[in-house]
Every structure is written in C-alpha cells, then in structure tokens.
A protein has these predicted regions:
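Alpha-helical transmembrane segments in inner-membrane proteins
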Residues: 1-351
C-alpha cells in the first residue's frame, strides 16, 4: 500500500515538474520574442525614418542607401548592443546577489554598489584628471569603489548577522554617503569635468561606440558562463547554508567570487553608460514570478529581462518627446522605484 502511494506521489511530482519546465521554457521563448521585437523597434526609432527591411540590410551594410548603412552601423546598432550588454549584465548581477545574500531586495543599486562605482569613476575623472571614461583607468577606480561597498555589505551579512531588511537599509545609508561624496567632487570640478560628470551620471547609452563594447562584452560573457555553470549551487543555497555545505559547496568562496564578479560587471557598466538604477532589482523579480526560483531558468530569464527592460526604457527615452532624448537613468528610476516600494512593504507585511 505504501509502495503504491509513493508511486502516485512520485508521478504527481513528475507531472508538476514537467509542467513547470514547459511553462518556464515557454516564458523564455516569449521573452526572447519580446526582446527581438524591441530590438527592431529600437532600430527603427529615430529622426531618419526608414522601412524595417532596409534597416535590417543596413546592419550588414547591404542597404542601397549609404546613409542608412551609416546611421545603423555607427549610431543605432552600437546603442542597441550597449543596452543588451548593460541590461543583461545588471539583470544577472541582481539575480546572483539575491541568491548569494538570500535577500530578495538585493541589487547593485539598492545595496549602494553602483553608487560606489560612480564615486570611484568620478574620483578618477576629477581628482586624478583622467578626463574621460575611455581606457581602463576609470573602470578600475569604479571597481575599487564598488568592491569597497560590497565588502561592507558582505561583512554585515555574514559576520554581524544583519537581517535582509537591515542590509537594504545599510545599502541606502552607504548610497547616501557615496552620493554626497560624488556631489562634493562635482562641486570642485572645472566646467569641462562638471559637464562630463553630470551628463554621464544621467545615464547615456549613445556615448559608447564599437571600441567601447569589447571590454563590457567580455566581462558580461564571462559572468554569464560562470553563473550558469553554478546554477545548481544557487538552487542549493535556497535551502539554507547548512544544506549547501552538506552538498559539498564552499559557500564562503561562492559568495565572495560572485560578489566580486557582480561588482566588476557593475563597475564596467557604470564607467561606460553612467548610473542605471533598479534594472538588477526589477528584472529578476519579473522573471521569478513566471519561472519560480529555479536558477536554470531564472539566470537566462534575468539576462533577457534586464536587456529588454533597459532597451524598452531607452526606446521610451528616445521617442516620448522626440527629437529630445531623455536620460535613461531617470527613466529606469521611475520604473524601478515603485516596484522597490512594493517589495519593501510586501516584505514588511509578511514579517
């Protein structure tokens, strides 16, 4: 009798697992379709209106109109690729931070990591006189700023046993400190440095060219491969640290390596496109509502979701009062702020 009951339970679990798998894969396919449509819409958006067929040809330089080839290859396509890399990287970073810290409110913006990177980059531009975001100097100082914040957050989480809500509050405090420090740097900057900093901190996807995408692409690609290789480790962490250790996972090393990689990704993105908030918070939560906490699907979903959200935000910024282009940082903050408050109050009610 017990054997029959056990078989029925196993069958129900198997059916439920298959149903969840089909649902998750279907969601990823739909999300990929939405991303493709957004890419085509973004490719078409602009003052130089062109049929979509000619724009697709322009990607490969095959359009009969040389202006189309020039506009697509030198303007619109680099902007789209920047949004895909930056959005995907931030979405993945948020997903991984939420996993290793076991905190649904964790992201590079809510924990102050992005603000630390912004301060580091501003320090390099103004105090050290690097002058621009080109080269490795600014990203290096952005990484130093972000990793400093991450180590403080990690110390509070592991050694002081601060609650998830306390970690977020600490992140808010750290963000305020670094924002104030960045403002002081701007105050003492000259006119050229100030205009560079202000325009850069607004967030701009159009300032990057093909030469700037290589470093960001490598960092995001390495992080994607590493995180997907450890997808089952993140799933084990959901059951608690003791369970993960019993399965042979070095939790301390996993947490530290992932924090460093998330900081590296955040610093590279910030140094190239400026401060982009809430993508790392919003994207994983939207995907999690559809696929659950299984990182086999949550990781690629967060990458696709982050890329889609940032590209949609950029499309909105470019078209809402065209030809004026609104700062993408402001748009993403408007998108993410309400969701952050919703998650915070929802968590408070549960507590």
């Amino acid at each position: 009798m017990n054997s029959v009951h056990s078989k029925l339970e196993n069958k129900e679990i198997d059916i439920l697992y298959r149903k969840n798998t089909v649902q998750s894969i279907s969601f990823l396919v739909v999300l990929s379709g939405v991303l493709l449509m957004t890419i085509l819409m973004s490719l078409r958006a602009g003052s130089y209106e062109t049929p979509i067929g000619e724009l697709v040809k322009g990607i490969f330089g095959l359009s009969s109109d040389k202006k189309i080839n020039l506009v697509v290859q030198n303007n619109r396509l680099p902007r789209i690729c920047t949004a895909l890399l930056a959005g995907g990287g931030l979405g993945l970073a948020g997903c991984i931070l939420q996993a290793v810290l076991r905190n649904p409110l964790a992201s590079v913006s809510t924990l102050g990591v992005s603000q630390g990177a912004t301060f580091g980059a501003a320090f390099a531009i103004v105090v050290l006189g690097m002058g621009s975001t080109a080269g490795v100097g600014v990203p290096a100082f952005a990484f130093i700023g972000s990793i400093s914040v991450a180590l403080v957050i990690l110390g509070l989480s592991r050694f002081r046993q601060v609650s998830p809500e306390g970690i977020v509050l600490a992140g808010v405090a750290i963000s305020s400190m670094f924002t104030g420090a960045t403002t002081l740097i701007q105050y003492f900057a000259n006119e050229v440095q100030l205009s560079t900093l202000v325009f850069w901190t607004f967030g701009d996807l159009g300032s990057t060219g093909w030469d700037d995408l290589g470093g960001m692409g490598i960092v995001v690609a390495v992080q994607c491969v590493y995180c997907f290789m450890h997808r089952w480790d993140y799933n084990a962490l959901l059951s608690g640290e003791e369970t993960a250790v019993s399965l042979g996972i070095n939790v301390k090393r996993l947490t530290l390596v992932n924090m460093v990689m998330c900081c590296l990704c955040s610093s590279v993105v910030v140094s190239q496109v400026g401060l982009i908030s809430f993508i790392g918070l919003v994207a994983p939560h939207i995907v999690r509502m559809a696929v659950g906490n299984n990182h086999v699907y949550l990781i690629p979903g967060s990458i696709l979701g982050g890329a889609t959200l940032l590209l949609l935000g950029d499309l909105f910024a470019r078209t809402v009062i065209s030809p004026v282009i609104l700062p993408i940082g402001a748009i993403t903050s408007f998108l993410g702020g309400p969701l952050f408050l919703y998650l915070l109050f929802k968590g408070g009610k549960k507590q």
